[in-house]
Amino acid sequence: MLHTTQIRMVGTGSAFSKKFYNNSALVTFTNGYNLLIDCGHSVPKGLHDADIPLESIDGILITHTHADHIGGLEEVALYNKFVLGGRKIDLLVPNTLVESLWENSLKGGLRYSDTYDDLSLSDYFTVRSLKTFTSGAARTQLEENIAIKLYPTFHVSHMASYAVGLEDRGEDKVFYSSDTIFDEYLIDYALTYSWVFHDCQFFTGGVHASLDELLNYIPEEDQDRVFLMHYGDNMEDFFTKTGRMRFALQGRTYIL
């Protein structure tokens, strides 16, 4: 058993990054449960390069259905089923996304195989539907000492997307924004957690919070608890322009 929660950043890049893998984090809770948040198309390669075997992952949580967050699921599903002998891991999906994740994203590549016909998502994963609300936090108990809170985010019109609050042994430990525009109310929720991992872009406008918006809103005394992620390939140009916030670095493990 670990003494504290750990996060390893498998990828920290934006959807179009070529220097960094798709934004994804492997969370290890104090009871040893390994949860991968999001699995974009480049994440399986990121796991391989970080020497993280799929066998070590207990569950994957999906925050929304853009390809840089779900594009690696087909590979994971097929590898577990046909290389690892049908091993099923947890797939944690917001209840608003379960149907669309399969019908609109994964079904085309996973419905049929050379030995099986008309497969479903539950043939590959132990699907665990997570509660959602239209505002505020919806809490789902995952295991005895682990709970997941989902917060709806504004990312792209007509697409459900969620930030994630991670509770470990009763403590609101980590807030993980995934993808969101700048949202004062969401940041207020985030700052109730011990640590914050927030997406960041280097211009204002579009579908992510900008560095300037975060700098101007988050109090200086709270900025040292904030790590910036989901950034562009020009991240190094802004390395000294983040106030007391820091960039989450790909491959780095954060002991929280």
Curated annotation (Swiss-Prot):
Cofactor: binding details: Coordinates 2 Zn(2+) ions. One protomer coordinates the metal ions and the opposing protomer provides the catalytic residues required for cCMP hydrolysis.
Q: Which Pfam families match?
A: Anti-Pycsar_Apyc1 (PF23023)
PANTHER family referenced in this protein's UniProt entry, alphabetically: ZINC PHOSPHODIESTERASE ELAC PROTEIN 1 (PTHR46018:SF2)
Q: Name one GO molecular function term.
A: 3'-tRNA processing endoribonuclease activity
* Catalysed reaction equations from the record: 3',5'-cyclic CMP + H2O = CMP + H(+); 3',5'-cyclic UMP + H2O = UMP + H(+)
Described purpose of this protein according to its UniProt entry? Counteracts the host Pycsar antiviral defense system. Phosphodiesterase that enables metal-dependent hydrolysis of host cyclic nucleotide Pycsar defense signals such as cCMP and cUMP.
The segment annotated Beta-lactamase-like runs over 21-230
The family annotation for this protein states: Belongs to the anti-Pycsar protein Apyc1 family.
Question: Has UniProt tagged this entry with the keyword Metal-binding?
Answer: yes
User: So where does Zn(2+) 1 get bound?
Assistant: D68, H69, D179, H230
Native species of this protein? Answer: Bacillus phage BSP38
Necessary cofactors = Zn(2+)
Which residues of this protein are catalytic? E74, Y112
* Record keywords, A-Z: Host-virus interaction, Hydrolase, Inhibition of host innate immune response by virus, Metal-binding, Viral immunoevasion, Zinc
UniProt-recorded name of the protein: Anti-Pycsar protein Apyc1
